[in-house]
From Swiss-Prot:
Catalyzes the transfer of a dimethylallyl group onto the adenine at position 37 in tRNAs that read codons beginning with uridine, leading to the formation of N6-(dimethylallyl)adenosine (i(6)A). Transmembrane segments: none annotated. Belongs to the IPP transferase family. Monomer. It comes from Lactococcus lactis subsp. lactis (strain IL1403) (Streptococcus lactis). It is an enzyme of class 2 (transferase). Substrate binds at residues 13-18. The lineage of its organism: Bacteria, Bacillati, Bacillota, Bacilli, Lactobacillales. Residues 36-39 are annotated as: Interaction with substrate tRNA. This is tRNA dimethylallyltransferase. The gene is miaA. Its cofactor is Mg(2+). Its EC number is 2.5.1.75. Keywords: ATP-binding, Magnesium, Nucleotide-binding, Transferase, tRNA processing. One of its GO terms (biological process) is tRNA modification. The record marks 102 as: Interaction with substrate tRNA.
Length: 294
């Protein structure tokens, strides 16, 4: 039987995805593919909470430091490169583990976005948003009306089928070629927000301000500069706000981003979450992964 099992660890910023990903990779002979839109950039280490060299030495990591910060990295780029990496890792007899919080990237990978490149991307995302508002019954009815012979429908396959009717060739497979296990991490909101605030303070101690200043001075208009943890300091550098106000902006925007991440994973991807502070964590996840891989 073809080996096509892929683990996917998602959740809000600062919840502990990196640590779990490394634990899973060690326990199940895996390699990690970053699903973070900012960690692809060389030199942006602190503000992106990039995995450290010590962490990368424990298990192989991919899609880290693969772009200069003057280059763009799109959802299309991610899906193409992640699919190739998944194949290479599976061919080695190892387990690919996607770890990240960029919902659009991960959803597009799982649902098999390879619909003719970026030119169709906006239209496809609009259709996907419309389909995501339908109930399962409404979705399945649309699919069966087009092809009554389709069996074993689930929500993901139904959305993929309807996308292909609009944008892709009709003989493509429904969804990705891989079998994904989604692992969602979460924590009590107050605890999570406290962790976010503490992490920003730690980033400041590690030199985030200098990293942001370098980006501001060299390439303030690039895609990488739009990430949380950098753009908030630009008004400080131009003399419009105080440093304290800039730091508070980073914390506020990070908390808001965490909320948006949770909304995306819950509503658009139907992720079930594990509380990282539950008594037996992460043993239930290990049990679920063992069952999935076997």
């Amino acid at each position: 039987m073809k080996n096509n099992k892929v683990l996917v660890v998602v959740g809000p910023t600062a919840v502990g995805k990196t640590a779990l990903g490394i634990d899973l990779a060690i326990k199940f002979n895996g390699e990690i593919i970053s699903g973070d839109s900012q960690q692809v950039y060389q030199g942006l280490d602190i503000g992106t909470a990039k995995v450290t060299m010590a962490e990368q030495a424990q298990v192989p990591h991919h899609l880290i430091d693969v772009r200069k910060w003057t280059e763009n990295f799109s959802v299309h780029d991610f899906v193409i490169e992640a699919n190739q990496l998944i194949k290479e890792i599976l061919d080695q007899g190892k387990v690919p583990i996607i770890v990240g919080g960029t919902g659009l990237y991960i959803q597009s990978l799982i649902e098999g976005y390879h619909l003719g490149g970026q030119e169709n991307h906006e239209e496809m995302m609009k259709l996907r948003e419309e389909l995501s508002l339908l109930s399962d019954e409404e979705l399945f009815a649309k699919v069966i009306k087009i092809n009554p012979d389709i069996s074993e429908l689930n929500r993901r396959r139904a959305i993929r089928f309807l996308e292909l009717q609009t944008f892709g060739s009709q003989d493509e497979n429904l969804g990705s070629d891989y079998d994904f296990l989604l692992i969602g991490l979460n924590a009590d909101r107050k605890v999570l927000y406290d962790r976010i605030n503490q992490r920003v303070d730690q980033m400041m101690r590690e030199g985030l301000l200098d990293e942001a200043r370098t980006l501001y001075e060299q390439a303030p208009e690039v895609q990488a500069a739009k990430g949380i943890g950098y753009k908030e300091f630009f008004p400080y550098f131009s003399g419009d706000i105080s440093l304290e106000e800039a730091v508070e902006l980073v914390k506020r925007n990070s908390r808001r981003y965490a909320k948006r991440q949770l909304t995306w994973f819950k509503n658009r991807m139907s992720v079930e979450f594990e509380d990282v502070f539950s008594k037996n964590y992460p043993e239930p996840i290990f049990d679920k992964v063992t069952q999935f891989l076997n």
